[in-house]
C-alpha cells in the first residue's frame, strides 16, 4: 500500500502529479488546477471534441438490435 506523508490537516505534503491526457504536460492534482486532469481549458475542450467526434470510445459489445426502427426493410 502506498502511503504519502500527511500533515496535521490530513492532506498529502507532497503534491500528486498527473499527466494531462491531451498534451502529456505534468499537472499538479489540487484546487490550484481547476481543469484537472487537464492542464488547461483548451486541452479539456480538445478531449471533449474527440469524444464528440467518436475518435475516442469505451469498448463494448455492439448493439445489433433492430428495436430502433431504422431497419432496411420498412415493410412497404
Swiss-Prot record:
GO MF terms, alphabetically ordered: DNA topoisomerase type II (double strand cut, ATP-hydrolyzing) inhibitor activity; zinc ion binding
Region entry Disordered, spans: 54-76
InterPro entries named among the record's database cross-references: DNA_gyrase_inhibitor_YacG (IPR005584), Znf_NHR/GATA (IPR013088)
Chain residues that bind Zn(2+): 20, 23, 39, 43
Keyword Phosphoprotein annotated: no
Gene Ontology annotations of biological process type: regulation of DNA-templated transcription
Protein's job: Inhibits all the catalytic activities of DNA gyrase by preventing its interaction with DNA. Acts by binding directly to the C-terminal domain of GyrB, which probably disrupts DNA binding by the gyrase.
Family: Belongs to the DNA gyrase inhibitor YacG family.
Assembly notes: Interacts with GyrB.
Protein name: DNA gyrase inhibitor YacG
